[in-house]
Amino acid sequence: MAKTKSKFICQSCGYESPKWMGKCPGCGAWNTMVEEMIKKAPANRRAAFSHSVQTVQKPSPITSIETSEEPRVKTQLGEFNRVLGGGVVKGSLVLIGGDPGIGKSTLLLQVSAQLSGSSNSVLYISGEESVKQTKLRADRLGINNPSLHVLSETDMEYISSAIQEMNPSFVVVDSIQTVYQSDITSAPGSVSQVRECTAELMKIAKTKGIPIFIVGHVTKEGSIAGPRLLEHMVDTVLYFEGERHHTFRILRAVKNRFGSTNEMGIFEMREEGLTEVLNPSEIFLEERSAGSAGSSITASMEGTRPILVEIQALISPTSFGNPRRMATGIDHNRVSLLMAVLEKRVGLLLQNQDAYLKVAGGVKLDEPAIDLAIVISIASSFRDTPPNPADCFIGEVGLTGEVRRVSRIEQRVKEAAKLGFKRMIIPAANLDGWTKPKGIEVIGVANVAEALRTSLGG
């Protein structure tokens, strides 16, 4: 009898080794190597492979291939359609990740209910809840649709058989880390199980043209659990994020083969489920305390939509040898960089000051155009001088203190004017080449010192 062979696979990065190691050479993680048995391919599989090689299609010139634009299937959640690129594409495999309890299952259950109807049937497969638990959650959301079918199963073979037998219009698998194939020795959620189960679901989606949504767990760092292999295999990767203590939830696309990865959908968690936020700028600014030192407003582009958000800063003398720099919703390295610019180019003595910054509403911002608002908030708190509450700030700040040009300035200014702001501080390079809306004064500044004089009077 032949000896059974095994290999050790890192559960963080997928690195393979013939022997166990405490530290993975690939990613440096400790105690992540798990033993998995090497299974030989059966003779019938090799025969089938050789047969498929003989019958493979011949290469065709790209100009001779006929295509047809199939309409996307839209849900009743416009924000969900926006992030997907306009709706659900037939035959697509969509991965949704997020922290535990953030609302992934709630979102997909609502989407399933909206997609199901007289002509569409949806199969919701839960590996974490029984059918009764899923029904209780559906009752809380007011979902009672006979075209929505629920299955509690984790065996990939039974799941595949159920899809083949029912032939639904849409499928949801919650979650991929609970699904397993019985002929693989490793535990559910391991690299081999996730790879093989995802490959099987992808095969079903592509051959039958069924859109499949799969839920993925995230690690404590916030990324999809396991190696990047799962994200490479699927067509679309969505992250559902938000603060536990806030009602707002944000859906972002980090990979999308059928649309933009810059779009963002905003939802609010209520007792009846998730509802879309149609005017996020107004929601984020409704609790703003106008006239407070350390507060400024900026217009950030999230995909094709400008969103006005409040950036708050608190600067206070440090009680320790090294001052603290903390930021929520903004990269703390950017905060340190901009504080260094204020010290060197403007002369603010911030080396002995603690700095605490946050974006109100739990939004995460990463575009350079918010730099000027961060600088204004820091200087305003340090001088204890509030900026004009009717001012809005846009601009990227360079290391020499210059305020650099940003994109889509006209859309940003129009959004600020729509919400009642009277003055817009923008880069001087952005003043020409577009139509300025009525009712708002647009002022161009060339550097940080000029921006501070304009907004804080000194």
Curated annotation (Swiss-Prot):
Disruption phenotype: General sensitivity to DNA damaging agents. Increased sensitivity to methyl methanesulfonate (MMS), decreased survival after UV irradiation in transition and stationary phase, decrease in transformation with chromosomal DNA requiring homologous recombination. Increased sensitivity to mitomycin C, H(2)O(2), and nalidixic acid; a further disA deletion suppresses H(2)O(2) sensitivity but has no effect on MMS sensitivity, suggesting radA and disA might work in the same DNA repair pathway. Partially suppresses DNA damaging agent sensitivity of recU deletions. GO terms for molecular function: ATP binding; ATP hydrolysis activity; ATP-dependent DNA damage sensor activity; damaged DNA binding; zinc ion binding. ATP binds at G98, D99, P100, G101, I102, G103, K104, S105. A zinc finger (C4-type) spans 10-27. DNA-dependent ATPase involved in processing of recombination intermediates, plays a role in repairing DNA breaks. Stimulates the branch migration of RecA-mediated strand transfer reactions, allowing the 3' invading strand to extend heteroduplex DNA faster. Binds ssDNA in the presence of ADP but not other nucleotides, has ATPase activity that is stimulated by ssDNA and various branched DNA structures, but inhibited by SSB. Does not have RecA's homology-searching function. Belongs to the RecA family. RadA subfamily. This is DNA repair protein RadA.
